Structure formats: C-alpha cells, structure tokens
Regions:
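Class I SAM-dependent methyltransferase Rossmann-like catalytic core
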Residues: 251, 269, 276, 281, ...
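Class I SAM-dependent methyltransferase core
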Residues: 304, 334-336
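Residue-level recognition of the N-termini of beta-strands and the immediately preceding loop/turn
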Residues: 29, 56-57, 145-146, 328-332, ...
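Conserved SAM-binding loop of SAM-dependent methyltransferases across substrates and taxa
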Residues: 339-357
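Phosphate-binding P-loop
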Residues: 22-26, 322-329
C-alpha cells in the first residue's frame, strides 16, 4: 500500500531547472484534464470549440496501459494548432500548449511551472494519477488552477477537484449526456466539489471566458496584497448581506482569502465589477448561500492526519479509559467537522483501540459545523469511491458498506456519532 500523505502536500525536491515564478509576471492559468475510457473523443470535441489564444496551458492525465503505444500527441495534434507535447521530467510548461502524460508514467506533478514524472511500478497500489496531478496543480497554481474531469470508468479525480476548489480554483465535470463513460465525472459530482457540469463544447466556451477574467490575475496565496479602500467598503456590504441572510459575521476573516472566494464566484457568473456582484447577491439569495459555502472552504478527508490518529490511540484514548470504570461513557466533541470524514475517522480509531471492550462502553461523539449542507452530508454518511485512496482495504471492509454510488459508514459507527449545526465562535459549547 502507498503511504498516506498529508493532504495537498507533495514532497518534490526542485531540480536546478526549476525557477520559482515572480508574483504575477510568470503566472498563467493551467487546466488539468483527467479522463480514462472514451476520453479522446470528448477531448477532441473540447479542442474543436477551444480558442487557440487563451494563454492557458493544458495538461492531460489519463488512465492508459503502460504498454500502450505512444500515439496520443500525434492524434491530438491533428485536431488543434496548439503544440501537443508528451510530458517529460523537468519540462517547463508554456501558454497555449498541450501536454500529455505518457502511458508508462505512474504520476505526473507540477512544481513551480515544471513537470515532474515518476515511473509507474507494476501492480503496486491503487492507480490514481488524476488525483495526484490535480492536487499538485492546486498547490502550484492555487486560484490559477482549473480542473476538468471528462469521460471515464474509475473513481479517480474527485479528491483532486476538492484540492483545486479549496485553493480558489474552478472545477468542471462532463455532463452525463452525451458522456459515454460517466463513472469518473459522476463520482466527482457526487463528492460535491464541481462548479460546472457541462458538455465538452460548453466547457471550452466557459474556459475561453475564464481565461481572461481578472480573478486569474490575482496573486498567489503566498504573495501579500492589501484590499483597497473601495474593496473594503464593498466587502462591508457583502458581509452585511451574509450576516442578515445566514447569521454569520465574516468581518474578522482574512480579507485576501475572502476576496479570492468572492472573485472566484464573480468569475463563475461572468461579473467584472464588485458592485455588479453585490447587486447580483441582493437579487439572488441562493448565491448568498453559494458564497457562504465557498468561504467555509471544506477541506477534509478520512484519516487526513495519520500521526494524529496514532497519537489518539497511543496517548489520549488510554488516558480516557483509565479514568473510566468498566462501564462508562466516552464523550468527544469535534467542532468544524465539515462533511463528517474526520469525525468518523476518530470513531473508527476509537473502535479499533477498544476492540471487544467497545461493547462495555457508552460512546457519544458530537460533531458540529456552521454549514448545514455539510452537516446533511455527514448525517447521510455516504462518500464517493475516491475514499479508497485514504481508507485501507481492512477498514473499508470492517467499517463501510459498499453502495452503488460509493461507500456508506456502517451502522455501528453512525450510531455513536451525532451531527449538529453549531457555531463554535458564537454558540455555547456542548455540555
């Protein structure tokens, strides 16, 4: 099994050819496209509708047999005037170029605008090249990252889109009609991190607009910038709308982060001025909900911090049990639980620690979040197949039930977890 890494962090050492781009000059949007079965036909449709001067780079990651003949660049070059290049290690990406992952590659990553390849070991671990690349794309390009999931039969890609959306990028999935193989896009959609569900032609049209939108010229997260006086006033109006509609005050949040989320929403609605977006918010209450969800940035996964889980089992749980009698109550509160993955991870870890002793204990795990949509999903306890990357086969078999749409947490774990809407900054704690 591949060792679980911390979310969105890739241990890649820069080569001598790597040069970190300056604040804005060398940054341009990069579109990561993931697919498997039936993808070439749909990608061709996207190419035919795609302008040649978007100033974007396109990087294609697909599931192919390592023995597959390397003809993809030649086949794709017939459909576009953009240069189509097979990705190679240490290659600097350029605007208006298409890069294709070679079939023998296990993983393709992007660091400081440079491609890195790791050869695919035969028959080892789950093969998730789309997730791996999209996570690196999110880390490298942040709000300049765009993720597209096309036709395919697998569960790869959902976690990669989550990473892109969390860093302020924009995400697409191909609509089921006329998608020949819909497993990959449907799994991504079910995970809840897709901004647009469109046909290949519609995706190309939307990309053409987004390419020149000011949102993508916003500096990266590690570049400091301050909101202007006008932006400060406009932010106050938006905060007031959200406070009246939802009851949450975002005044104390980092302005740069908030501005990125707002400008992301503006790009999606093709609005160039903040004043126009404020008017749009005033006349579209549903958009206030969408902006609220965007601001919360629900980044989570099962067992996302393996070291923390091990510390609970080795240090914290033994202390709790030591303080209890043979028959006692264990109560745990997990605030900001998002869609429930971390709360269920703690519950599973506790069950593993207790073993047969679990039957003698009364366990109550309270999990809370301000996001009603996230709490609703946590209560359903159904997750896409992409969790196979984070949950080992033994845990999947013992604590999950296989469903057509993915996996559901088993009844025993669900019975000890209570989810509630709660603002940890304003509401009193659980007694």
């Amino acid at each position: 099994m591949k060792k679980q890494a911390k979310p969105f962090r890739l241990d890649i050492k820069p080569t001598k050819s790597d040069t970190k781009p300056s604040a804005e000059t060398d940054i341009f949007p990069v579109v990561g496209i993931g697919a498997s079965a039936g993808w070439l036909n749909t990608f061709t449709q996207l190419l035919h509708a795609q302008p040649m001067n978007t100033d974007m780079a396109f990087i294609v990651v697909q599931h192919l047999d390592p023995k597959h003949i390397r003809l993809l660049p030649e086949l794709m070059a017939r459909e576009t005037v953009m240069p189509v290049i097979e990705a190679r290690d240490g290659l600097n990406i350029k605007r208006n170029h298409i890069y294709v992952m070679p079939p023998s590659t296990h993983s393709l990553t992007l660091l400081h605008g440079v491609l890195h390849l790791i050869q695919r070991p035969e028959g080892r671990g789950k093969y998730l090249p789309i997730d791996h690349f999209l996570k690196s794309l999110a880390q490298d390009r942040q709000n300049n990252a765009i993720g597209v999931i096309l036709s395919g039969t697998a569960s790869d890609g959902a976690l990669g889109l989550q990473a892109i959306k969390a860093t302020g990028g924009i995400t697409f999935a191909q609509s089921e009609n006329p998608c020949e193989f819909s497993d990959i896009p449907n799994n991504a959609i079910a995970a809840g991190d897709v901004d647009f569900i469109l046909t290949p032609k519609e995706i190309a049209e939307k990309l053409a607009f987004i390419a020149h939108y000011p949102h993508l010229k916003f500096p990266l997260f590690n570049v400091e910038s301050k909101a202007t006086t006008q932006e400060d006033e406009e932010l106050k109006k938006i905060f007031q709308l959200l406070r009246e509609h939802i009851g949450i005050d975002f005044t104390g949040y980092k302005k740069n982060t908030i501005l990125r989320r707002i400008k992301r929403r503006m790009a999606m609605h093709q609005l160039n001025r903040m004043t126009d977006y404020i008017k749009f918010l005033q006349t579209h209450p549903k958009e206030q909900d969408m902006l609220f969800h965007d601001m919360l940035i629900n980044v989570t996964s099962f067992f996302r911090e393996p070291e923390t889980i091990e510390a609970l089992k080795k240090e914290i749980f033994p202390q709790i049990i030591q303080q209890k009698s043979n028959v006692g109550t264990i109560r745990i509160w997990i605030p900001a639980c998002s869609t429930g993955e971390e709360a269920y991870s703690v519950a599973i870890a506790l069950f593993e620690f207790l073993g047969t002793q679990v039957n003698t204990m009364h366990i109550q795990i309270f999990a809370s979040d301000v996001n009603k949509q996230a709490i609703d999903k946590a209560r359903q306890a159904i997750y896409s197949q992409s969790i196979e990357e984070a949950v080992n086969p033994g845990r999947l078999q013992q604590f999950f039930v296989k469903k057509k749409s993915g996996y559901q947490i088993c009844q025993a774990i669900r019975d000890v977890c209570d989810f509630a809407i709660h603002n940890a900054l304003q509401d009193p704690p659980f007694p």
